[in-house]
């Protein structure tokens, strides 16, 4: 864990739970793609940079999930580096309590205010700022989270953030986090047609060809959608739907999984209703969902 892996002349990744990209701009300065999940991750990254004689120019955040921005505060405090982000992701990075609040749908209890869902805050500079390195292409990858992006480096390595999960992860957990199902599927279509010397997803193996994995992710989305539709053959409330999803996939429920899977199931319900496959009605002061 935390090994430095070279994928091109100027690009590396640090192998950790959410891969951290490294772009060597010149012999002295590097840009990180994300920063790991906490202060300890940031410290390990700093040791790697020091060992190679690299100065940290900036962190480029793909999105604001805590496992991608958790090292920001430590690294920014140690080096004075900029942290680049954009859109809603920038707001969540500056005000991290927004993530557990959004997931829970209200003020999060202490069980949800921890480093896995709520990073420490960091100062943010927008991607549009003149100081952002012009040689790096910012690629919009919405769907998994609000304004998630990837980055194409000058030597044609693309860091894909969380837009695809590994087969192993999908086989084990089935329901990967998705904020906007329609946007996510469009992102998968776009990524499937993308060409690069190497793709580096945060939660799957780096590869020059990711088309099969993209298709596997897409198939899993449609599988989950069909499962939800089958659960909704008779009018049913959200909590019962969530219970059946957990039981159907053999998932274990705790506060963290309740909000992560629960938020995703709500996103599926919205998508299925908006595409005419689910109806919703209020009965006896309850919102009930039913397949059309």
How should each PLM-predicted stretch be described?
Residues 10, 23, 34, 49, ...:
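Divalent metal-coordination and catalytic microenvironments
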Residues 37, 135-225:
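Metallo-beta-lactamase
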